[in-house]
A protein has these predicted regions:
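Active-site-proximal beta-strand elements of phosphoester/diester hydrolases
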Residues: 34-47, 143-153, 186-188, 236-240
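The substrate-binding groove and active-site-proximal loops of carbohydrate-active enzymes
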Residues: 43-50, 79-88, 151-165, 191-194
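Extended active-site neighborhood of metal-dependent phosphoesterases/phosphodiesterases
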Residues: 87-179, 199-214, 225-260
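Short acidic, glycine-rich surface-loop motifs adjacent to enzyme active sites
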Residues: 176-195
Length: 260
């Protein structure tokens, strides 16, 4: 977006029905053989005090890393839980957090987590989508294809599970048909994938033809790297959080530092 590093790759459809036209100007980028992807887990901003910490600690440290990267292109993505649950429907508060995120020195992509949703609504992430855009999207950088997916499924006001809807599986299938299997495939979602989740078999089957597949996730407030046998081996990176132990200290639940 203009004046912000938050990536604006979409246009909102008007509420009224009928035909609508949106024009996009595409600019060809040079092929980046090397780049740095900075992953931020769970900022989970819950107050103005924690927003200041996120700005002065996390964002400042990220910008220092970018500054030290020289000519290496940098990108950032948040794995969701950008806000605490009591703020997910506060438009002004979301705008404040978005402004802080937009102060980074490189493009910033965003996905949603369970705390970014209003489980009591039919469309549980209306405010988050109004602020940041689509919840499922993809993009290419260099030789990698990145796919961002919402994998939080609420069943009522409090209970949620992990997985993907039939519509998401269909969308992912169509998306991957356009991608060479020689590309590195990176799937970014909020919750790590475990032994069981909705549409597990259909999801794994779509990834088997790719030579190298990674999953980036957050959610657990600790760091974990595991190999998933799907039967193809897929490397899952679970990232520690910006908020650590919910902004109560400067460490995550497993003792690793707050950060990215």
């Amino acid at each position: 977006e203009e004046g912000s590093s938050i990536v604006k790759f979409y246009e909102k459809l008007p509420a009224e029905q009928g035909e609508h036209r949106q024009d996009f100007i595409l600019e060809k980028k040079s092929y980046e053989t090397r780049f740095r992807m900075i992953v931020v887990g769970d900022p989970q901003v819950k107050s103005m005090a924690s927003l200041e910490r996120f700005k002065n600690e996390t964002i400042t440290a990220i910008n220092e890393t970018i500054g030290k990267s020289g000519n290496l292109p940098c990108y950032i993505i948040s794995t969701g839980d950008n806000f605490e649950s009591n703020h997910h429907d506060d438009g002004l508060y979301l705008a404040n957090v978005k402004e802080v995120m937009g102060g980074t020195l490189c493009p910033f992509f965003v996905i949603n987590g369970n705390h970014d949703k209003d489980a009591g609504k039919g469309d549980a992430a209306t405010e988050h989508k109004d602020c940041f855009g689509p919840m499922n999207y993809s993009f290419n950088i260099g030789g990698a294809h990145f796919v961002c997916l919402d994998n939080i499924r609420f069943s009522n006001d409090t209970d949620y599970s992990t997985g993907f809807t039939d519509a998401q599986i269909e969308w992912l299938e169509q998306d991957l048909k356009t991608v060479s299997t020689s590309r590195i495939l990176v799937l970014i979602m909020h919750a790590p994938l475990r032994s069981n989740f909705t549409n597990k078999d259909a999801f794994w089957s779509l990834l088997q033809s790719f030579g190298e597949v990674h999953i980036f996730a957050g959610h657990t407030h600790d760091n974990e790297n595991v190999t998933l046998k799907t039967p193809k081996e897929i490397y899952q990176h679970v990232h520690g959080t910006a908020c650590g132990a919910w902004w109560k200290s400067d460490i995550c639940a497993d003792g690793t530092p707050n950060g990215y």
